[in-house]
Amino acid sequence: GVPCLCDSDGPSVRGNTLSGTLWLFGCPSGWHNCKAHGPTIGWCCKK
C-alpha cells in the first residue's frame, strides 16, 4: 500500500515516519483511521 502521515507522526510529511497506509475504501478489519482529517482520496489507516 501507499504510506501516509498519521496524526501521531507529526504535522508534516518532511522528516517524519509515515506509519499509516492509504486505503481507498475505508480501513480494513482490525485497522483504525489514524488521521482526523483524511487525505483527499481514501483513508489513512494503521494496525
Swiss-Prot record:
Provide the disulphide bond pattern: 4-44, 6-34, 27-45
Q: Which domain of life is it from?
A: Eukaryota
| GO BP annotations listed | regulation of signal transduction
| Cellular component, GO, one term | extracellular region
Q: Which UniProt keywords apply?
A: Cardiotoxin, Disulfide bond, Ion channel impairing toxin, Nematocyst, Neurotoxin, Secreted, Toxin, Voltage-gated sodium channel impairing toxin
Pfam families (alphabetical) = Toxin_4
Q: Which Gene3D superfamilies match?
A: Anthopleurin-A
Instruction: Give GO terms: molecular function aspect only.
Output: sodium channel regulator activity; toxin activity
Family per UniProt? Belongs to the sea anemone sodium channel inhibitory toxin family. Type I subfamily.
For this entry, the protein name equals Delta-actitoxin-Aspp1d
